[in-house]
Every structure is written in structure tokens, then in C-alpha cells.
């Protein structure tokens, strides 16, 4: 497989890069597909007379083939343009074992590239960039709903913790393991699913993931003991987490720089709105029935998504699309020589292990750009799951909201929506400057993060210091603070993700998998100590600690705005734009 050199400028909008996929394989758009079937060559070759000195049987056949190709300049079966003379390979058969059965060696075939299929120019309707807008919008909705179902499954379990503690006679931290193990599954699986999607395509990975996710949620809902619940929760997260790494890569497949930022914005909202929306829905479910219906609801939702992906989602991975095109042409023409470049990829077990496990991890710890951005992103993601424990402490224990105590989460969603609109507007400004200057470095994606990095610690400190005094301060005050926190969550997460994708475009799935691996680890760990920290230190001082950490990370986007291009220039994987 080939990839763009890290020292060559890359313009996502440039015609020569229009067909680049977010994978390790490049496809060069071309309008020509030359087909020389071996049976045709033999047929034509048999009409050529041998005018040279006496040759061996094999040499005569080879010479005949070469003469046939030169003498039969004709129209291709595939395109009605004249086919140029192909380059014929010369093969030394002297050291080869016999064919068997007394048969001579077959004639030498032309260069393999003559048979390679490509996209038919930048306007090829087969290319995902050129799919109808209605089709791409439908696929985006399906993929975003898939992400929401996965992330809702992580936090909806929190509203059933009290019932689980009573039924199975365990302390809350044991029940919270149901959340931790689920999110640990998020951390474990993307490093496998994302590179696999670059080898075998997006569709198969998403179909398997959505089916397995629905299956294991039904298993949790029907489990008879706590051990089964915990094991099935882990596998639900492990199998279901593929969209968290594959969906951004699928969006990169379908959209160029003009639209990609907006599509990733929708994905980010799905990742963050799901965990916040789930407790609001779950609180109403547990008020009227048992915790098992929390899992039944997610399982039914996931089943509907599985059906939608199975019947409506088309393969978007560019090299995999060309593989399908080659198979169709072989079937229609009978020419077994037609192939896609991606079909020539032969991976050993070692190479598969490197591409599915070690590469994302190696990238994470050897790429300073990816590591620093991921640490910041992971801290923000951990805060998201920490709030699942902090909000009940403030509003249920402090303000006495024992019924519908999860409603203040809605302020977080409002803040996220406001930030989504802000980033959408900033993306329009990004594109205006992109067209004016003829290109922008990926660091330009970090500008919204500068604002969000300041707003985020304000929201945390506001929430914790006002929520610590429920007898003096009205509940609406810490509730409003949630809008600032939600603004910061999306405003930091989304530019980080866009920056990673723009910087590692050809291997975006692996880069996102590395990011998902670390941030899911943070998301799994934070709920375990959240209760002890807020109850032990007090809501105010726990918030002070988190706020100071958030303040310490404010300079991160500023540093990359200044030093990012130089870091990428020295990178093994990132583009030097």
C-alpha cells in the first residue's frame, strides 16, 4: 500500500487528492481501464508468423504475444478509446518448475497496472464525494444515531444503580463497575475495529458491531446474576464501540474539507449528547419499572439501527469500493486480470496485528501532536462521565431532587447545542479563509478551542462552588453553569477531533482509534473515584482541583497554533501542509 509522503504538501480540495480515502491506500483517478484477456492475446498471437531465427517453444509464444499486441492496436472492450501498446513483462522460466502434464509455460502477460481499475475522474458518481446530498444526509443520520445509541448505553445504566445495589446487596462502587467496564470496552475495541475498516471496509465492521451491541444489551437485560451483567456490559461496550472510531473516517470518506467539519460536528454532538440524555430518559423508566427496561430500551434502539445499517448503508471506503467495481467488471467481461490495487494487499498475521493493535498505540506514544491533543481530549471526556456522579450529589443529595433529579443535565445539552452552532459558524469562516488563501494548515481548526478552553473551567468552578451551598444558593445557579460546561465539552472535543483527522487524513481511522483508546480509559476511571472525591473533599474543593487542571490546559491550542506545523513536518505519519 502507498501513502502520501509526509514532506509533500497536501491540499484536500486539490483535484489530484480528490479521491484520497482515510486509509493507507491511495487511488489515482483515471478515465482509462485497459483490458487484455489472455485468451485474446493467444488468439491474436496464433495469427502471427515467426519471422525471426528459430526459438524455443516458450520464447516463440512470448514473441508472438508481443507481436500480437503491437499488431492489434484496437478498441478496448470497456472504453471506446484506442488502447496504447502495453508493456509486456519478460519472465525467465529457466529456474521455474514445470507446469505439469507436459504443458508449456503460458505466454507472458502485460504489466499488471494495465488491468487496474480506478475512479473515472473526479466526477465519478461511484466516488463517495459525488454521492447525492440526500443519500449522504441519510447515511449521516444513521451513523449519528448509531453513535448516540452506543453512548446512551454507557450512562443509562447509572439510573439503575440504586436498584441494583438493593437487589444484589452490593455497595454503589461495585454497581458503578457496570459503567466502567462498558467504557473500558470503548477503549479496547477501536484499536482493532478502525484499522480493520481500512483493510476490509467500513460497512462490514459497522454491521457486525451494531448486531453484537444489540445482542449483548438483550443479554444484560435478561441476566440472572451480577457477574453476567458485568461481563455482558463489557462486551456490549467492546463490540458496540466501532462507530466511535469508524464513523469519523466514514465522514472523511464522504465529505471533502468544505463539509467535513460540519459532519464531524454532528458526530461529536452524538458522542456527548448520548451520555447526558440517557440519565434523563432512564430516570423516568426506573420510576415506573425495573432497571432491566433500561437495557431493553437500548437493545431495541440498537436493533433498529442495525436494520438501518444493514439495508441502507453503502460501503464508503474508497479502496473497498474499487474492489467491488473490479469484481463486477470481472463478472461482466470474464477477464480475470481486472483488479483493484487494494486486492493486492496480502497481510500476514504479524502485519494484521501491527495494523489492528500496535499501530494506533505506537502512534499515540510516538506522535507528540497526537499524544498532547489526546490527553486534553481525554481529560474533557473523563469530566463528562465524572459529571454523571457529581450531578446526583449536588441536586439529589444537596437540593433534594429525589424525583427527576436528572433534569439539570438538560443545561449541559443546551450548552453543547450552542457550541455546536458556534463551531458551525466558525467552520464557515474557516472555509472563507481557506478559499481566499488557497489552503489552510490544520491548526486553523483549533481556533474555537481557544474560546472553549476558557469557558470550560469557568463552568466547572461555577457549578461546584455554587452547588456546594444548596441552603444559600438557588438550584438554578449551578444549573445555568452546566451550559458553560457543556459549551466547553464540545468546544474542546470537536476541534481536537477535526485537528487529528486533518493531520492524519490517510490513516484517520487509526489516529482516531488511538484517541478513543486513551479517552475511553479516562471515561472508565473517572466515575470510580468521583463519588469519593466529591464527598471527601467537598464539592467546592473537588471542583477547584478540576478547574485548575482545566486552566492548565488552556495554552494547548495556542502552542499548536505556533508550533504545530513544525511538529507535523518531523512526523512519520502526519501531513506537512
Curated annotation (Swiss-Prot):
The chain crosses the membrane at residues 137-157, 167-187, 204-224, 234-254, 263-283, 293-313, 368-388, 406-426, 446-466, 475-495, 504-526, 541-561. It holds the Pfam family MFS_1. The keyword Cell membrane applies. Residues 1-63 are annotated as: Disordered. InterPro entries: MFS, MFS_dom, MFS_trans_sf. It comes from Candida glabrata (strain ATCC 2001 / BCRC 20586 / JCM 3761 / NBRC 0622 / NRRL Y-65 / CBS 138). It is a multi-pass membrane protein. It comes from the Eukaryota. This is Multidrug transporter TPO1_2. One of its GO terms (biological process) is single-species biofilm formation. Belongs to the major facilitator superfamily. DHA1 family. Polyamines/proton antiporter (TC 2.A.1.2.16) subfamily. Multidrug resistance transporter involved in resistance to azole antifungal drugs such as the imidazoles miconazole, ketoconazole, and tioconazole; as well as the triazoles itraconazole and fluconazole. Also plays a role in the resistance to other antifungal drug families such as the polyene amphotericin B, the pyrimide analog flucytosine, the fungicide mancozeb, and the polyamine spermine. Decreases the intracellular accumulation of clotrimazole by mediating its extrusion from cells. Plays a role in biofilm formation. It is found in: Cell membrane. Induction: Expression is up-regulated by clotrimazole. Expression is also up-regulated during biofilm formation. Keywords: Cell membrane, Glycoprotein, Membrane, Transmembrane, Transmembrane helix, Transport. GO terms for cellular component: plasma membrane. Glycans are attached at residues 44, 58. Disruption phenotype: Leads to intracellular accumulation of clotrimazole and increases the susceptibility to clotrimazole but also to other imidazoles such as miconazole, ketoconazole, and tioconazole; as well as triazoles such as itraconazole and fluconazole. Also increases susceptibility to other antifungal drug families such as the polyene amphotericin B, the pyrimide analog flucytosine, the fungicide mancozeb, and the polyamine spermine. GO terms for molecular function: transmembrane transporter activity.
